[in-house]
């Protein structure tokens, strides 16, 4: 590792592919996988992740917005791309020309897309999003009152609805009745639409990471793992999957300092040394993505031993207690999370979820890929 690099993440594309194949091995015949690559592939680097998934045989990926999809197409990613977030309808021609599939969750949005495509000779592939209980976006299917709107969307000449999907609120809880209710609403709505219109949705999908593990009956035609793909479980249930964390965060000790009993550390003087202490300064802070809410709660690994973080995490640095690890010197590498100290543990201590820690890794944290 270049010693000029202060803080970095190592991303194992080999482990990513291992996770893809491990999840794939649990899917029924004919069930496709869509790898969720939004938010720069949860901080892992969307281009490199998508390229590796494509090479491994993945048929679909999902991003949130047009810019994310355009970047992937420019990098040679040719597989199917689903845009989960709504785009401005006035770029409908660009969407169709880019060859992506757009999520459509309201009749107003469907009409606008169709209007901007009128007279172009283009059709935009789309997946209809159904709101079954997440409380966000999608055609409301709590009852049949919006059926006419969904049927109208299916009839629009410039939209080609190849798929239909929904999103679960609590699928990481096994046997949850609310997830069962959402699934029932989803299937009922599809059945009503197909019977009334004669339209057949080629791809039905609803299983996010939690449902991949907990609800195999909900895998249907395609599953949408995000966190699982990167080797992190959304909850304690693993479903027997042998996954490997693809990302590890490291920082190099910049200085070792000595402090006396009663000395205070960092902003706000929230930590007082209970005895003479030896601290290691790590050049990683909340500007890099190390959440300030982890202040005084997390550990790092140095020489295979845990060193507690003390005082408030600063913008560009933090301090850890190495009093009991006398061998620590400037230049030593600290593991902040990885295979031996999970991102899930750090997230729990910070009072958040692994998604936030992974996505928080800023651009100044160099990505080092292991291929």
Task: Give the ranges of each region predicted by the language model.
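Active-site anion/phosphate-binding pocket segments in diverse small-molecule metabolic enzymes
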Residues: 2-13, 17, 67-68, 87-89, ...
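Active-site-proximal beta-alpha core segment in soluble small-molecule metabolic enzymes
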Residues: 2-3, 7-10, 17-18, 31-203
């Amino acid at each position: 590792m270049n010693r000029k690099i202060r803080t970095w993440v190592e991303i194992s594309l080999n482990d990513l592919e291992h996770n893809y194949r491990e999840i794939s091995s649990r899917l029924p015949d004919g069930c496709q996988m869509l790898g969720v690559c939004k938010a720069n592939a949860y901080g892992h680097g969307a281009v490199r992740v998508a390229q590796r998934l494509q090479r491994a045989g993945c048929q679909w990926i999902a991003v949130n917005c047009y810019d994310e999809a355009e970047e992937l197409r420019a990098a040679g990613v040719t597989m199917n791309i689903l845009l989960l977030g709504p785009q401005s309808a006035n770029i409908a021609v660009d969407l169709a020309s880019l060859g992506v599939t757009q999520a459509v969750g309201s009749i107003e949005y469907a009409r606008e897309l169709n209007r901007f495509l009128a007279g172009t000779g283009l059709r935009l592939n789309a997946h209809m999003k159904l709101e079954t209980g997440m409380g966000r976006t999608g055609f409301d299917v709590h009852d049949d009152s919006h059926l006419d709107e969904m049927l109208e969307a299916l009839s629009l000449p410039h939209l080609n609805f190849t798929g239909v999907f929904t999103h679960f609120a609590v699928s990481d809880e096994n046997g949850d009745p609310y997830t069962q209710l959402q699934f029932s609403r989803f299937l009922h709505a599809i059945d009503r639409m197909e019977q009334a219109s004669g339209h057949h949705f080629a791809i039905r999908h609803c299983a996010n990471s939690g449902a991949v593990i907990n609800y195999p009956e909900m895998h249907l035609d395609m599953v949408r793992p995000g966190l699982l793909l990167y080797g992190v479980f959304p909850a304690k249930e693993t479903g027997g999957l042998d996954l490997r964390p693809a990302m590890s965060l490291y920082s190099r000790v910049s200085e070792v300092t000595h402090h006396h009993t009663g000395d205070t550390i960092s902003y706000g003087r929230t930590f007082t040394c209970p005895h003479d202490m030896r601290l290691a300064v790590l050049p990683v802070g909340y500007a890099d993505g190390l959440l300030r809410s982890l202040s005084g709660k997390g550990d790092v690994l140095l020489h295979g031993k845990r060193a507690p973080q003390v005082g408030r995490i600063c913008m560009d640095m933090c301090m850890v207690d190495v009093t009991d690890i006398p061998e620590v010197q400037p230049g030593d590498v600290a593991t902040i999370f990885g295979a031996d100290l999970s991102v899930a543990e750090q997230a729990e201590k910070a009072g958040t979820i692994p998604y936030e820690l992974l996505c928080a890794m800023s651009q100044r944290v160099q990505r080092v890929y292991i291929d």
